């Protein structure tokens, strides 16, 4: 065993005796792997040798080596498949068809028969087009467009190729639009007629159990409410807040109500903007707007009904306060949530002479509310609707007075019993 280096590559050799001469010969074995770049060079040389041997094998005579024949495309016609032959024939036919020149590009003398046939076809086409246009002209005047046709007809211009008949009237855009308006569908008109011609509800159509006629009037209408009242034997309650022929001066009891506006950064604080007082019969005895003592930040028009122009012509606050205090002195004061009204007027009134409809227990139990609104009390007890949109201080005072008058005897008797002092035992002995 000996080792030699060739071109920087270590190769191991083996001494083998030959059979013929008996001499010892060296036989090269696989190269020993060497570290570093020497190993890379050996790999590159081995690859080059493999590529050269493959190229030499491929460049040989066709058919000499089976691997070379399989790798190259066939050149002899007998080696092609049937599909390939069919594809070649198809491509030849297409190329021949493309090489033929068009008839229109050739001279007329070369193909006279083909040109005559084409001319006949063109003449037949033009005749058919003329016949169609004549039919359209004849039917245009006689046949009217259907109501569902919404296309706007444009009058023919000079550039359009078709000539108008002499004496024919030109159709303008206004004529077309008016004609279309006349042909509009009539479903809207019929629907409106059906709605207007609806019959009034009869007794057979309406049937309610334990429903207030006033609620029926809100939901369906006055006719239905009238039929329900007739069936129940009721009459529509017509309670007036004001007696027409009554005394218009100051009475023993007066009702007060104030409308307020908002002041302050957010308009949360309230000041008086309108003060109204009515007497026992609902007659207005005092009604004045009040000039604001502070800048108004929220007029609350949707609720109060107060507008800036109302306050410009108002009275001074101190004047209103003095006049109201003189009117209420020694009288019964009626109202709803009176503590709010007295607060904005900076007034006080004896508690025994205040009749607040919000605090009257029979009213609260009747409407099942601890703090009922004036709107709810008026609707449930009086059958009158107030405060539907903007509030009116006169109407609110009239409603509060009307509620008080209805239960005046009961209310006054209950307050008298509450004020009467309890009898002491000594007083009972003297009486006995």
UniProtKB/Swiss-Prot annotation:
<feature type="region of interest" description="Disordered">
    <location>
        <begin position="42"/>
        <end position="177"/>
    </location>
</feature>
<dbReference type="GO" id="GO:0006308">
    <property type="term" value="P:DNA catabolic process"/>
</dbReference>
<dbReference type="Pfam" id="PF00929">
    <property type="entry name" value="RNase_T"/>
</dbReference>
<comment type="subunit">
    <text>Can bind ESR1 and ESR2. This interaction is abrogated by estrogen and augmented by tamoxifen treatment.</text>
</comment>
<comment type="function">
    <text>May function as an exonuclease.</text>
</comment>
<feature type="modified residue" description="Phosphoserine">
    <location>
        <position position="123"/>
    </location>
</feature>
<comment type="similarity">
    <text>Belongs to the REXO4 family.</text>
</comment>
<keyword id="KW-0539">Nucleus</keyword>
<feature type="cross-link" description="Glycyl lysine isopeptide (Lys-Gly) (interchain with G-Cter in SUMO2)">
    <location>
        <position position="127"/>
    </location>
</feature>
<feature type="compositionally biased region" description="Basic and acidic residues">
    <location>
        <begin position="121"/>
        <end position="137"/>
    </location>
</feature>
<keyword id="KW-0540">Nuclease</keyword>
<dbReference type="GO" id="GO:0005730">
    <property type="term" value="C:nucleolus"/>
</dbReference>
<dbReference type="InterPro" id="IPR037431">
    <property type="entry name" value="REX4_DEDDh_dom"/>
</dbReference>
<dbReference type="InterPro" id="IPR013520">
    <property type="entry name" value="Exonuclease_RNaseT/DNA_pol3"/>
</dbReference>
<dbReference type="GO" id="GO:0008408">
    <property type="term" value="F:3'-5' exonuclease activity"/>
</dbReference>
<dbReference type="GO" id="GO:0004519">
    <property type="term" value="F:endonuclease activity"/>
</dbReference>
<keyword id="KW-0269">Exonuclease</keyword>
<keyword id="KW-0832">Ubl conjugation</keyword>
<dbReference type="GO" id="GO:0006364">
    <property type="term" value="P:rRNA processing"/>
</dbReference>
<dbReference type="GO" id="GO:0006281">
    <property type="term" value="P:DNA repair"/>
</dbReference>
<dbReference type="GO" id="GO:0003690">
    <property type="term" value="F:double-stranded DNA binding"/>
</dbReference>
<dbReference type="GO" id="GO:0016607">
    <property type="term" value="C:nuclear speck"/>
</dbReference>
<dbReference type="InterPro" id="IPR012337">
    <property type="entry name" value="RNaseH-like_sf"/>
</dbReference>
<keyword id="KW-0378">Hydrolase</keyword>
<dbReference type="InterPro" id="IPR036397">
    <property type="entry name" value="RNaseH_sf"/>
</dbReference>
<dbReference type="GO" id="GO:0003697">
    <property type="term" value="F:single-stranded DNA binding"/>
</dbReference>
<feature type="compositionally biased region" description="Basic residues">
    <location>
        <begin position="42"/>
        <end position="54"/>
    </location>
</feature>
<keyword id="KW-1017">Isopeptide bond</keyword>
<dbReference type="InterPro" id="IPR047021">
    <property type="entry name" value="REXO1/3/4-like"/>
</dbReference>
<protein>
    <recommendedName>
        <fullName>RNA exonuclease 4</fullName>
        <ecNumber>3.1.-.-</ecNumber>
    </recommendedName>
</protein>
<feature type="domain" description="Exonuclease">
    <location>
        <begin position="230"/>
        <end position="381"/>
    </location>
</feature>
<keyword id="KW-0597">Phosphoprotein</keyword>
């Amino acid at each position: 065993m000996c080792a030699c280096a060739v071109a920087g590559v270590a190769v191991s050799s083996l001494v083998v005796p030959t059979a013929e001469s008996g001499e010892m010969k060296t036989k090269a074995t696989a190269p020993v792997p060497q570290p570093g770049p020497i190993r890379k060079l050996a790999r590159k040389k081995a690859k080059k040798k493999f590529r050269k041997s493959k190229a030499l094998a491929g460049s040989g005579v066709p058919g000499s080596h089976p691997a070379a024949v399989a790798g190259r495309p066939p050149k002899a016609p007998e080696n092609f498949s049937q599909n390939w032959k069919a594809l070649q024939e198809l491509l030849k036919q297409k190329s021949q068809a493309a090489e033929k020149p068009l008839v229109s590009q050739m001279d007329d003398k070369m193909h006279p028969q083909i040109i005559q046939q084409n001319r006949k076809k063109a003449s037949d086409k033009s005749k058919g087009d003329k016949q169609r246009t004549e039919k359209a002209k004849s039917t245009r005047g006689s046949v009217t467009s259907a109501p569902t046709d919404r296309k706007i007809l444009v009058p023919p211009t000079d550039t359009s190729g078709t000539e108008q008949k002499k004496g024919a009237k030109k159709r303008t855009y206004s004529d077309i639009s008016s004609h279309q308006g006349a042909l509009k569908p009539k479903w809207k008109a019929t629907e409106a007629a059906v709605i207007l011609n609806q019959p009034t509800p009869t007794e057979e159509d309406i049937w309610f159990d334990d429903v207030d006629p006033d609620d029926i009037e809100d939901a369906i209408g006055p006719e239905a409410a009238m039929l329900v009242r007739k069936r129940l034997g009721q009459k529509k309650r017509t309670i007036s807040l004001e007696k027409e022929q009554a005394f218009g001066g100051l009475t023993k009891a007066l009702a007060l109500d104030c409308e307020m506006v908002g002041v302050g950064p957010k308009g949360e604080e309230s000041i008086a903007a309108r003060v109204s007082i009515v007497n026992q019969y609902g007659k207005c005895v005092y009604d004045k707007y009040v000039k604001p003592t502070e800048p108004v930040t929220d007029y609350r028009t949707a609720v109060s009904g107060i507008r800036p122009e109302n306050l410009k012509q108002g009275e001074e606050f101190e004047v209103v306060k003095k006049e109201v205090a003189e009117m209420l002195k020694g009288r019964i004061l009626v109202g709803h949530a009176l503590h709010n009204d007295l607060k904005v007027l900076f007034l006080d009134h004896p508690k025994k002479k205040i009749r607040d409809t919000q605090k009257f227990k029979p009213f609260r139990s009747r409407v099942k509310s601890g703090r009922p609104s004036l709107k709810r009390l008026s609707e449930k007890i009086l059958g009158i609707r107030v405060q539907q949109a903007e509030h009116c201080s006169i109407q609110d005072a009239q409603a509060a007075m009307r509620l008080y008058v209805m239960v005046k005897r009961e209310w006054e008797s209950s307050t008298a019993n509450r004020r009467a002092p309890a009898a002491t035992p000594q007083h009972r002995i003297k009486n006995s």
